[in-house]
């Protein structure tokens, strides 16, 4: 929500063209120290993200009107966020609003497809899958500070809006 409010100002500092190259720089010592302090906790955080992602999958898998990630056997996904495709855009808007009102930071992730942001020589209707994702994708938090109550609140909101 904070990002959405500050987006007009932040957009002034964003690139408006694809990058031509990537510059590798040395990290400041503060970042090195911070990284060394946090790195030992990484495995715990990855495990919690994995657990929360699987829990959301099981809480939402029986709802119609949703498409969830395909979880293959013998694969250990460590979710950055949990992606959900919601077929009905009006329901997506209501779900997003209710989640935000409940204090659950969800996001559309892609405001628009890349070929709409930059003049890359493509037509607006090109890349139909990217266009669909931009209109129907909602991502849910799975970070280590998401608790079982948050996950159940997410399920309740989806249930109330999709029944």
Identify the residue ranges that each predicted region occupies.
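PLP-dependent aminotransferase class I/II
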Residues: 1-163
